[in-house]
Amino acid sequence: MDWRAAEDLACDFLKKKGYRILERNYRTKYGEIDIIARCGKETVFVEVKSGRGKVDPLERIDMKKVRNIEKAAKLYMLQKGLKGPVRVDFVRVTPKGIDHFEGLWLG
């Protein structure tokens, strides 16, 4: 499965959980945020990882990636003039299904 299909599945999954998708593939100088959504009053920045092999796709997320997501999230909030709580979620898409890890990193 390619990254685009994984992100499409992740978006559909989040929408079914009541999330409102604001942006996809939002690019900044710090990198790209796969999905930006609203869940209640929170702005949620979602990193999507997919894979088929024996290595867990989440293992490809290191601290540098997390720091860059946090910087990109802060920049997004500033550029859009948004305030309020934020969080970073991770969605893992594999042939076995979709797993959603909420609030693994708070900005």
UniProtKB/Swiss-Prot annotation:
SUPFAM superfamilies: Restriction endonuclease-like
Membrane-spanning segments: none
Gene Ontology terms for molecular function: nucleic acid binding
Highest rank taxon of the organism: Bacteria
Pfam families with a match to the protein in the record: UPF0102
InterPro entries: Restrct_endonuc-II-like, tRNA_endonuc-like_dom_sf, UPF0102_YraN-like
Family note: Belongs to the UPF0102 family.
Record-linked NCBIfam families: PRK14677.1
Official protein name in the record: UPF0102 protein CTN_0433
Protein species of origin: Thermotoga neapolitana (strain ATCC 49049 / DSM 4359 / NBRC 107923 / NS-E)
